[in-house]
């Protein structure tokens, strides 16, 4: 028996077996991260819905005018408090996807992860409870990344495993927000990791399925399932013309949406008023919209759902509501308060599709019952135009609605939209936010940065001698971590499971991160 074990150890099978055990442990911990993320992100969603209903009941009761004053003052105080939280903890600002990518890349670090998690949770709920047009998905992604980070700290895992748990938590956060585990895994790959590694796909899927299961248990009724998607009876060339039209309209408005929102986000800090005065302006707009069309507040998701189920509305009214929602979302997002842009983007795309559908009904091309079909395709395509994550956009709409009828049209329109947005030179929204974050005055950059990559079996680095590797200029391998020990790099032959630490200039992180990580991975 002992001779057999010694023989296994000598021919390397023992090491492979240990690596498989380490992977199994990582997958098990990913499931745990998904469960914890679901237990945090789902209550986040529940409380957002609770406060939305509370506000709805208040405004729907049409109280005497003097009852609005204490509510207005209370919400003003809430926004001032949340803006103070953001000032104290800058990483909780906005949606959270760029911040999550920054932590994974090593640009920033969660210095006080538990406090920041609580601040993001509380700040996001309070900001959206006032009616601002913000989304829940970005904060859910960052909440999940905080959970993954904390579990990695408590579990004392390696730096490579920590990144996988961050990926798992981020994916689980989106899965908890939409009950869409497959789309959540794709979002991590397309928007955060930005290339496909098998281990990342597995960890995010495992965590996403668990978190999505928790979300489905708490929210068993998915309102998107009630949207009908009736395919219009059109010829092949009629469908081609329709898809080209939708892609062109979505691409042009996507360009306008991205440019306007980002310009407003840069103009907002330059407004020479105290922060509490800016919050007063923002709340005043939210109050007016709450009294005029309540469902447009809180991101506008309820308004989108009502229009998708009953799309036969006057076209001029929908145009006005879409423009109002767009302006309100732009102001809300530019404030920097905790809240994402994912749902406002979906709503804008859906309403744009409704406008196109109503025009086509007037021209006798389609019937009213086909408008929801157009809306779902435009929701997917608008995500492609703004965020540039085609796989996520296509799968998400199919997954949350359950309509396979829109899957193939979304692929065609999404592909055309991607091509048109490249022609229009629209940079991905989250990439611009990430660049703004790392170049902001508040960002402190260390001169050198250490990247840790795990060597996968069959990758380019597998079997290579460290001294023979030709790395980019000013990149140097400083350490090889193997079997829980640190080994000097000189003369080391790299093996699967090795954690290779590469030091580089901080200014080169974005340029070299993906090439260096891809050298250690297989596809």
What are these regions (language model features)?
Residues 457, 462-508, 512:
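Cytosolic Rossmann-like ligand/nucleotide-binding regulatory domains
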Residues 1-441, 447-449, 456-457, 481-484, ...:
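Alpha-helical transmembrane segments and immediately membrane-proximal extracytoplasmic
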Residues 448-452, 497-499:
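Short, solvent-exposed beta-strand edge segments and adjacent coil->beta transition regions
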Residues 512-523:
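Short, compositionally biased
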């Amino acid at each position: 028996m002992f001779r057999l074990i010694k023989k296994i150890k000598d021919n390397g099978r023992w090491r492979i077996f240990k690596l498989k055990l380490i992977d199994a442990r990582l997958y098990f911990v990913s499931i745990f991260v998904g469960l914890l993320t679901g237990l945090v992100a789902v209550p986040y969603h529940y409380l957002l819905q609770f406060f939305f209903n509370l506000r709805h009941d208040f405004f729907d009761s049409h109280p005497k005018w003097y009852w609005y004053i204490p509510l207005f003052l209370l919400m003003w105080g809430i926004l001032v408090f949340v803006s103070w939280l953001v000032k104290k903890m800058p990483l909780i600002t906005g949606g959270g996807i760029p911040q999550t990518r920054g932590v994974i890349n090593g640009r920033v670090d969660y210095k006080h992860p538990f406090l920041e998690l609580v601040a993001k949770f509380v700040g996001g709920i309070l900001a959206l409870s006032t009616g601002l047009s913000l989304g829940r998905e970005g904060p859910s992604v960052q909440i999940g990344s905080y959970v993954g980070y904390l579990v990695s700290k408590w579990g004392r895992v390696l730096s490579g495993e920590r990144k996988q748990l961050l990926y798992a938590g981020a994916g689980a956060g989106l899965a908890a927000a939409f009950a869409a585990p497959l789309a959540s895994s794709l979002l991590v790959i397309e928007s955060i990791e930005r290339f496909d590694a098998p281990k990342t796909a597995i960890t995010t899927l495992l965590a996403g399925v668990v978190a999505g299961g928790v979300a489905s248990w708490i929210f068993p009724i998915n309102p998107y399932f009630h949207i009908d998607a009736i395919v219009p009876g059109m010829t092949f060339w009629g469908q081609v013309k329709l898809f080209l039209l939708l892609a062109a309209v979505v691409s042009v408005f996507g360009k306008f949406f991205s440019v306007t929102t980002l310009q407003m986000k840069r103009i907002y800090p330059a407004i020479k008023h105290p922060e509490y005065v800016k919050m007063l302006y923002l709340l005043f707009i939210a109050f007016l919209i709450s009294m005029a069309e309540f469902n447009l507040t809180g991101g506008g998701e309820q308004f989108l759902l009502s229009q998708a189920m009953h799309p036969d509305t006057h076209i001029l009214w929908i145009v006005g509501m879409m423009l109002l929602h767009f302006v309100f979302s732009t102001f809300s997002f530019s404030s920097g308060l905790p809240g994402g842009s994912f749902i406002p983007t979906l709503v804008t795309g859906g309403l744009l599709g409704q406008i196109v559908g109503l025009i086509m009904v007037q021209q006798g091309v389609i019937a009213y019952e086909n408008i929801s079909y157009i809306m779902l395709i435009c929701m997917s395509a608008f995500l492609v135009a703004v965020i540039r994550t085609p796989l996520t956009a296509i799968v998400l709409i199919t997954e949350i609605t359950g309509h396979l009828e829109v899957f193939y049209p979304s692929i065609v329109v999404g592909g055309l939209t991607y091509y048109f947005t490249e022609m229009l030179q629209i940079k991905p929204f989250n990439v611009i936010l990430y660049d703004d974050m790392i170049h902001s005055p508040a960002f402190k950059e260390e001169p050198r940065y250490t990247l840790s990559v795990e060597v996968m079996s069959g990758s380019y680095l597998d079997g290579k001698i460290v001294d023979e590797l030709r790395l980019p200029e000013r990149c140097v391998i400083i350490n090889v971590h193997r079997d829980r020990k640190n080994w000097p790099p000189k003369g080391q032959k790299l093996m699967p499971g090795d954690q290779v630490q590469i030091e580089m200039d901080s200014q080169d992180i974005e340029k070299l991160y993906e090439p260096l990580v891809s050298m250690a991975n297989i596809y």
